[in-house]
Each structure stands twice: as C-alpha cells, then as structure tokens.
Amino acid sequence: MAYPSPKVYIAFNGLPYDVSPTFVDVTSYVRAINTHRGRTDDFTQFDIGTATVILDNRTRLFDPFYTSGTYYGKLTPRLQIKITATSAAVEYDVFRGFVSGWPVTWSEAGKDSTVTLQCFDALGLMANEQVPNDWSDYYTRSLAPLRFYRGNDSRTTGTIRDQIYDNLSLSTVSTNPTFFEQPSLAANIPGTSATVISYAATGTAQASPDRLSFACFMRAVTPNTTDDVYFNYDNGTSGIFIQIYQDGQYYIETKFSGGSRQGGGYIGFAPSSQSFHMAVSGNTATNVVLYINGQQITNTTNSSSARTGSNPEKAEVQFANFQDWSIYNLTLSSAQVNLLYNAGTGRFSETSSARLTRLVGTTSFSSSLCSFTASPVATVSEIGSGTGVVPEMQLVADSEGGNLYVSKSGVLTLTARRAVFTDTRSANVQATIQDTGSALKYGTEVEISYDADNLKNDVTINFTGDGQVVQTNTTTIAGFGASSTLIETQLNSPTSANDLATYELGTQGALVPRIQPIDLSPNTADADWTTILGLELLDRVTFIRTPSVGNSFSRAALINAIDHTFIPGQTQTQVSLSMRYTSPLILDDSVRGKYDFNYYG
C-alpha cells in the first residue's frame, strides 16, 4: 500500500503572528506525528487543535541549549509549524499551529535523544489572552486623545489625573477644597466618577489644531438656576465651550470658537439626576456637531458670538459629575462617537462576525487568517470585560448557533447558524464510507448506538440584560423523558433568543444514531488517500454498514473530528461522525428520515 508522505515544516526565523513565514522542511528528522482536530460531541464548540511531533535529536539539532547547533537561539516557544501529507503528487494541509516548547529527552544511556513537540492551533495561541478589562479606556486611547481625564481618582489626592498630559487641579476661583467621589456613570466603566465645583489645568499650548472634539459621560449637578455647568477647552487660538444651564428645563449650549470657526446651539436634555454621554466635534468646514448617547442632535443656531481663545492652553470643568472626559485634535466621526458611548455602556450591537472581528482586533492575530461568515443571523450586544478571548469567541459562536474552529490550513473560521445544511461541503457528500464495495473502507469493528443520552428537549437561552427564554418539546419529553440544556449568549433581544431556541430545540432534540469513532485506514485503496486527506471538519459523508443479515444501515453524517497518525511505513486516520444535522425526523411521521422544515428553518 502506498501511504501518504507526511512533511513537517518549522518557521525558525518567523514570529508567531507572521502570516506567511518562511518554513524549513525538517521531515527527515521526524519519527512520528499525531494530529487531532475536532470536538467530542454535538453540543460543544470545537476544541483547540493539537499535534505531537517527535523529532530525532541525536545530533542535538533541536536542543535549545546546544550552543553550536544550527538553530541555536531560534528554538523558542510559539514558533509556527505546518504539517502536510502528499498523495498522488498533491500536497494536502493537515495542521498549522504553534510549538509549545522544546523538551529534550535522553534515553538508552544517552545514545538516543528526541524532542517531542506539543503543538496547538490559533485558538491555543490566543487561549491565554484576555479582552480589555475596560473597553472605554481601550478605545479612548486608540483614538490618541490630547487629554484624557478618567475621574476615578481618590478625593484625598485633590487632583484629577490626565492620562495623557496635564492633571486637573483645584481652580483658584473655587472655594471647595476637593472633589467628590461618585459611583460610575456608565455600566462598563470600572471605578468612580468625579463631582467637581471648579477644576482646571493649564500648560504650554499644544500645536494649534484646526479641529477639536471632546467626549465624556456626565451628569449635571447645578444646584440652582444661577450656577451653570460647563466644560471648556481652548489652546489659545480655538476651543470648545459647552454650557449647561437651567431655564425651566435643562439645555446645552455649544460653541466652537477661534477665527471664523464658530457654532452654537440650544438643545434640551434629560434631568440632572440621569447620566448621559455627550460628544462635541467641529472643524473649519462645519459648525459644531453635538451627540447625546451616541445620537447626533440637530442644533438650533443662536446669535451668540464666538468665544475667543486665551493663552495658555486650558482645560476646565465646573459644576459637573463626569467620567472619561477625553479631548481630541480631530473631528470625531459618528462611528467614533458611538464607539466611545458603546464602550462605556458595555453594549456593542453588531453581528456575530463583526463581534469576532472586534475580539480578534484586541490580539495580534492577523485578520487575514480569519474567515467569518458573510451571512450571520445573530446580532449580539453585551460584551465581556477582562474575560478570556477564546471563551468570549465561543460565546459569540454560541449566540450565532454556528461553529468556531481552526481549519487545517490555520484559518480561524466561524460558520453561520444553518451552514451545516447549506454550505457546499456540508450539504453535498464529499465521501462514502462503507464496509463493502469500492468506497472508503473502515475497520472490522463498529458500534452504532441509538438512545436518548444526547437528546436535549428543554432548551434555555440566556441573553443580554439577564434575559432568558425557554422552549420545550413536549412530544419527546413524553416519549423519552426530559433532558435540559442551558446556552449562554450575548444576543440582543428576546426575539433573537427565541429564534435560537427554536433552532437548537430542533437540532438537539432530534433522536439520532451515534457512531463511535471509526478508523478509515484498514484496506483503504491507494487512490482513496486523496479523498481522506481532502476531508475537513463539518464535511458531509455517507456512512454505510452492511450486516450479514437483513437490510443495510445507510445515513449521511458530518465530520466532528479528524485524527491522523503518521509513523514510518504506516498512516492511520480516524474520524468522528455526527448525524445530528443530517438525520432530522418527524416523530409522528411514518417515513423515517423525512426532514422537518422547522428543524433547519
């Protein structure tokens, strides 16, 4: 039998996040290879893919402590590794990932030495990374502010720190010796906010910008109709002035001053007891643009004259409870304002694919090695803070009702909810696996189970804002007993949660056969290795068992896991199959295998 020829490549001169590193072929030193990609059941996301490669180290070529070695100084953790297999002159990807380390083993009285590489895929690379503890801080800094006052200082300091430039200190016109610590004004900003009477910071003028913006969360604390709340920033030639005052109800007046640049407006807003997010931006081409809680407000231009700048540069706040006040030498766009607002509230309403893109963006992993569905059905809102990147990604995948895995070529992949029914390789048979005939063969032993152990007929979906929906299948509960499952999501609405519950109840509530992992290698024809090596997770196959008595067993299935073993002179491949997405039955229909429309929507 002509087994496939495995190859192992290592990028000794590359870095973990390089997209296209230069790989070096080390196949001649390989003693054994094992790879695993997949999951153990139908109800969990795919595991981190792994590989084990045993290298001959008798010459100490792969010993990180051998100072005369060819790769000395380059045998570091997280080097990229690629495993392929060639059959019929075609090289197929088997695994791409990263080396955990370089453990050297000596045996046979020191005459033999090996290095056993434990490897993991991209999910493993990101497994120790966390999403930001504070999204507001993360995104504010990403916009490169001139000044950034968080307002979370201790009152004993008497100073409000600028994260970028100058601290805010007690203004000379104030009789209040300090500021007051208050609860956070936004759900996703940790720490405290600051209530001030009058605080200011002056310093050497910055380069004169031709545009200015600022944003903050705030609550007006004006004690009466004569004391106005205001934020002021000018750099000597231009500036923004925000005044909040009472006249039967609260109003905001905005001005952008300096030269011919000016704008003003009055707009009513919520009572002072309610916090809100405010952003103001302007430039030479337009008047001031005002945003409240991420929404642009149409200003009514007033007749006030432009405020004139004064040296030195000054940032000042009076009579306000504020948090995360940031000032920019740019015109904030609507998207940027929404980013700051959503970061503070911990709510980003976006598709599951957009959320994964956001999460990957907090790491150094390249977006060019990502493939997220272009047709997501889920909109998520809530977002975690300080949680692991990978668990957060899997939570998004659960919200979509899709699958998250790393392909054999190293691409981080998210499928859409119904991709198991509609994607080309999941909807069309890629191989037939049977015990007779000319198709792919499997071993002499096979176990087929038919029970309710993996059936879920009581589905609970948790969603954003501590919401929860529950759906049950009374027919299967009556027939097989109740079996519950809880799915945590970040879905944005009860409607979305109900849609997911309907889908999951249809798939998880189906009574389907289960096949133990099967070995494809015994008696496999040489030409069939090209088919085996071409298989990928979630590919559709047909499984056939022909007993010596009675009818045959023939069912479609999707691949849940693929394991390869390469040793000199032998190759073994084992697959785990799932019939959950290929065998939906209408329980009260006499035609076994008839599709239930509600099963796949």
Q: Language-model segments: which ranges?
A:
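Acidic, small/polar-enriched beta strand-loop surface segments
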Residues: M1-R31, W135-S174, F179-F214, T222-D227, ...
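Aromatic-rich beta-strand edge motifs centered on tyrosine
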Residues: I244-Q246, Y450-A452, Y581
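Short solvent-exposed strand/turn elements
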Residues: A109-E129, P568-R592
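Short beta-strand-to-coil "C-cap" segments at the C-terminal boundary of structured domains/repeats
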Residues: S326-T331, A416-A419, R580-P584
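Non-catalytic regulatory/accessory regions that flank a structured catalytic core
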Residues: P376-V377, E536
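Short beta-strand-centered aromatic/proline hotspots
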Residues: V94-V104, S554-T565
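Assembly/oligomerization scaffold segments
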Residues: M1-D134, P145, S154-A335, L340-S371, ...
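Envelope-exposed proteins and targeting segments
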Residues: G49-A51, F95, S113-V115, G410, ...
